[in-house]
Amino acid sequence: NELTSQYSVRGGNYDENLVYVNDFEIYRPFLVRAGQQEGLSFVNPDLVSTVNFSVGGFQAKYGDKMSSVLDVGYKRPTEFAGSITASLLGAALHLEGASKNKKLTYLIGARQKSNQYLLQSQPTKGIYNPSFTDVQALVNYKFNDKWEVEAIGNYARNRFTFIPQSQTTTFGVINQAYQLQVY
């Protein structure tokens, strides 16, 4: 389904995939669990440095999921940078930087998405107003070569508002098709 960010690996279900971001296990990596008209996945592509995907035979440190492991590494910035992206379905912004002595690094990403234009083609006519927003921050402080502290934070706001106006449903067989129209 192209409206979902969930994925299924052969031999398993979508909830049997393990997702790690910078060695933090993400327990509910998809912000909307229904699988339809979904918002944003937890992983923000503007912040990603590496992606490792295993579909079997992965290390024991990854635990007990059956299908796959998606291990994502976020960037370790060395200088100030950023990006802005805009499309018909949403927008994204990211900033990254490091202190002069490179002990403190930070990544901040914000995204907004709306499937409103795609949903207008649904058989149920009405006013669709889906809005998905998230902000992620990753801060790392390195005390010395052996000690460092890293924190990741995530804020998400997902709203799906729908005011139905009418629906037309077609059913039956090819030579006896019936339509039901509801206002």
Per-range role (PLM):
Residues 14, 26, 89, 113-115, ...:
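Structural signature of outer-membrane beta-barrel domains
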Residues 4, 14-16, 46-48, 65-69, ...:
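Extracytoplasmic
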Residues 25-53:
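Short acidic/polar hinge/loop motifs at secondary-structure boundaries
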Residues 1-28:
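Extracytoplasmic beta-strand/coil segments of soluble accessory domains associated
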Residues 50-61, 67-75, 81-126, 134-142, ...:
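Predominantly transmembrane beta-strands of Gram-negative outer membrane beta-barrel pores used
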